[in-house]
A protein has these predicted regions:
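Short hydrophobic clusters on alpha-helical segments that form packing/core surfaces
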Residues: 60, 82-86, 103
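A short, internal acetyl-CoA/4′-phosphopantetheine-binding micro-motif in the GNAT/acyltransferase core
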Residues: 63-70, 98
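Short amphipathic alpha-helix that is part of the acyltransferase structural core
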Residues: 1-26
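Short loop/turn motifs at secondary-structure junctions and domain boundaries
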Residues: 27-31
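Conserved GNAT acetyl-CoA-binding A-motif
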Residues: 86-99
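Conserved beta-strand in the GNAT
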Residues: 38, 43-64
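Conserved acetyl-CoA pyrophosphate-binding loop and the N-cap/start of the following alpha-helix
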Residues: 69, 73-81
């Protein structure tokens, strides 16, 4: 398994990013200014985008895993990688998400807590 930081041709990951954010126009707003990470296990499994929101806050804008690979821990591995990557750079990482029970469980299992709805 390998996680890569992607600096060029970020739109090549659009099909996967669209699984977590159905509006391409919204993805376009954060993709170029954000940091894109891709997790490979033989081939591409998951991606995420993190943006700087202030000196001490970053935001997880998008995290997606191909559906056939759900439940294999790829999303969690990617989250733990970015936690480590940004440790010391930011004091807070936020995420905005829907209220689907399975996605809330995923984020809570990986250390996020609900601050408001």
């Amino acid at each position: 398994m390998e996680i890569k930081s992607i600096c060029e041709n970020k739109k090549q990951f659009l099909d996967l990013l669209l699984l977590a954010d159905e509006q391409e126009s919204m993805i376009d707003k954060y993709l170029e200014r954000g940091d894109l990470f891709a997790l490979y296990d033989s081939d591409l499994r998951s991606v995420c985008v993190v943006t700087r929101e202030s000196d001490d806050v970053c935001e997880l804008k998008n995290i997606a895993t191909y559906e056939k690979w759900h439940g294999n821990g790829y999303g969690s591995k990617l989250l733990h990688y970015i936690f480590s990557h940004y440790k010391g750079k930011y004091t807070t990482m936020i995420v905005g998400t829907g209220d689907s029970p399975w996605i809330l469980r995923f984020y809570e299992k990986n250390g996020f807590r609900i601050s408001h709805r």
